[in-house]
């Protein structure tokens, strides 16, 4: 449905060229909730504005429904933009107008009669759960309610695509969850394609089925959400995953604890990652019964991503080196990814440094 081909965006700042987006190619299918995640300055907001040509690319092609919209006339582009709604971190509501009037403003040139507009606005308010607020003013609403109004306004012209630029960044965690649930509902009920810009991997995990990770204007990794969470390839992606699964907090606690992180001879501190049916397998029991390797679980969790369980364990493996190696080989054959976090030799080196 949306194809971005070799998109680059360059800004001229004084005498310096700044490349905000560098040679990015993405394909977003109809019905996707596609997340684009990255830290501030990664280029994600610039990229999403290319989709509706609020930002024209310096180079590349923008294909929507098999048409290159870069070739559209001004009139054709106006019609195209009606099919693309957009919401932002800041709600941009007109404070002197009621909620009803804020949405009605978007229908000003729709060709609908006053009665038809009234009926449509009532339906939109019902869709976003704000029917009782139609005569209220923005100042009387909470942040979450204001974003619901912004969503209703963005849907006024029956768009096929909804662009969400940091739409939950100004909201508390509970309200964020409610807005994400609403977006997921709209995606399912309206077959709405959603492109979600965020710096929070937790947001992506909640509703996206695909994700691209951006850094310094480039997409460093993209895949379906389960593959990204279960088999991240790039260091930045791994960092984002850890923040969304709280593994980084657990690992920091373990490594900084004087007893938990100290290993004896024939011990290793290891992280296991597994996905899908592997979460139901008694793998830890198998390590002892087959290889006489003891497993001390220091931390574990299971995340549900797109209805697929993804598990993580941080453990201390105990056994002679050959047995541990056989156990790790067995786990690899079962599809479990292993990452050696610390060895006895590293513990010993640290102790020697402390003595010195």
From Swiss-Prot:
Protein name: Methionine import ATP-binding protein MetN 1
EC number in record: 7.4.2.11
Complex and partners: The complex is composed of two ATP-binding proteins (MetN), two transmembrane proteins (MetI) and a solute-binding protein (MetQ).
Membrane association type: Peripheral membrane protein
Keyword Translocase among record annotations: yes
Keyword set includes Lipid biosynthesis: no
GO terms under cellular component: plasma membrane
Keywords noted in UniProt: Amino-acid transport, ATP-binding, Cell membrane, Membrane, Nucleotide-binding, Translocase, Transport
């Amino acid at each position: 449905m949306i194809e971005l081909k070799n998109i680059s965006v360059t800004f001229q700042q004084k005498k310096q060229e700044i490349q905000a987006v560098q040679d990015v190619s993405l394909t977003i299918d109809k019905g996707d909730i596609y997340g684009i995640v990255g830290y501030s300055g990664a280029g994600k907001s610039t990229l999403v504005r290319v989709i509706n040509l609020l930002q024209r690319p310096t180079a590349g092609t923008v294909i929507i429904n098999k048409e290159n919209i870069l070739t559209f006339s001004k009139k054709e582009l106006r019609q195209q933009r009606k099919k693309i709604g957009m919401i932002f971190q800041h709600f941009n509501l007109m404070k002197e107008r009621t909620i009803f009037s804020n949405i009605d403003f978007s229908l000003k040139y729709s060709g609908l009669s006053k009665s038809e507009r009234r009926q449509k606005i009532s339906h939109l308010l019902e869709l976003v759960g704000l029917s009782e607020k139609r005569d209220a003013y923005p100042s009387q609403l909470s942040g979450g309610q204001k974003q619901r109004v912004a969503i209703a306004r963005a849907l006024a012209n029956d768009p096929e695509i909804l662009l969400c630029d940091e739409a939950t960044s100004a909201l508390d965690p509970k309200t964020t969850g409610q807005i994400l649930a609403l977006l997921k509902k709209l995606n399912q009920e309206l077959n709405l394609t959603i492109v979600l810009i965020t710096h929070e991997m937790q947001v992506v995990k909640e509703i996206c089925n695909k994700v691209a990770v951006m850094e310094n204007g480039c997409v460093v990794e993209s895949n379906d959400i389960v593959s990204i969470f279960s088999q991240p390839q790039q260091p930045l992606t791994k960092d984002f995953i850890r923040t969304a699964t709280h593994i980084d907090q657990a690992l920091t606690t373990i490594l900084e604890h004087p007893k938990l992180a100290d290993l004896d001879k024939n011990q290793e501190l290891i992280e296991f990652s597994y996905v899908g049916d592997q979460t139901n397998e008694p793998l830890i029991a198998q390590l002892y019964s087959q290889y006489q390797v003891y497993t001390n679980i220091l931390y574990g969790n299971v995340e549900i991503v797109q209805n697929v369980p993804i598990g993580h364990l941080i453990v201390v493996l105990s056994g002679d080196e050959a047995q541990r190696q056989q156990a790790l080989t067995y786990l690899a054959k079962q599809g479990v990814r292993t990452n050696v976090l610390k060895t006895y030799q590293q513990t010993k080196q640290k102790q020697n440094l402390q003595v010195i």
